[in-house]
Amino acid sequence: VRRQLAPKKPSRKSSRKNNSLNKNKNEQAGDIGAAILSHRSGGAHGVCKGGGMAGNTSHKGLDFAKAVALNIEIGVSSLAAFDEVNAIAGAKIHLKVETGMGRNGFSDEWPELLSRDLSKVVGVMMHFARADEPNEAQNKLQIENFEARIAELKAKGVNPIRHISNTAATLSNESAKYDMVRVGIAMYGMSPLGRDNNLKPIMKVRAKLVVVKELPAGHPIGYGATVVTKEATKIGIVGVGYADGIPRNAVGAGVTFNGQSAPLIGRVSMDQIAVDLGPNTEAKSGDWVTVIGDNFDIYDWAKACQTITYEITTRISGRIPRTYIES
């Protein structure tokens, strides 16, 4: 992102009042990417104003003119998209090139692209396949391929802004930083390389206890009765479930109430999870708990679900209202 984005409060109202997601408002710059044209311009989480860069655009039919009017520089990875954007007065284009990811980016169309009018090209980019494995030879090979493309552009009179580093490369590869970087998960205060004490997670998911009740020892919990209480205890039913983005296969996670951990028990339901609050808890129906954050952060949930932190952050559904706060 090349310029500051102006944050805005969420515009969508939710009928579910028993949960919320808090993020530092500056996070909005992190998910601009490919979704900006279809989602961010007047979308659910705010309006992009005053510039930025939308990347990874390979297909036609998006409202490129609106993006240009908002002073957004557009990344393209196909000849069809390039021709469409290049025809717009005032457009600024970033070319995405294929260097070894095997996904989108100019490859077979590259020679034909070089025959086009490149006067609106201001940047060139690529994406690493193995940036979270800093010592892999493929990273060096991709940089070499990228440098070859830069040389070809310069031979055509283009001196582009160069950017190739995602979060992993930004944190681990000094040689890959070039003119700017494109951090994603780091804007959430997380690292794909594991916990980083220099980064502070900014996203927190909270929900309310809809029921708190006592159960005797030997009582089954949830679908399939996969868990039975070992002793008399109080369980809390939290108003959030897999329809809200809480993975159904979570094992070993939990919530935080008044600084105390309450482990998840039983299977995650569509709209609810059950947690063991302990026999002496003072929790009551209507109290807030922290589902993601505090004692069970994104890393804990990712481990509990045998997945990556990216999946946990991106799967939080639109049923949960967003609140942006300043720290």
Regions found by a protein language model. Give the residues of each.
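Active-site anion/phosphate-binding pocket segments in diverse small-molecule metabolic enzymes
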Residues: 1-7, 17-28, 58, 78-83, ...
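Active-site-proximal beta-alpha core segment in soluble small-molecule metabolic enzymes
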Residues: 2-163, 177
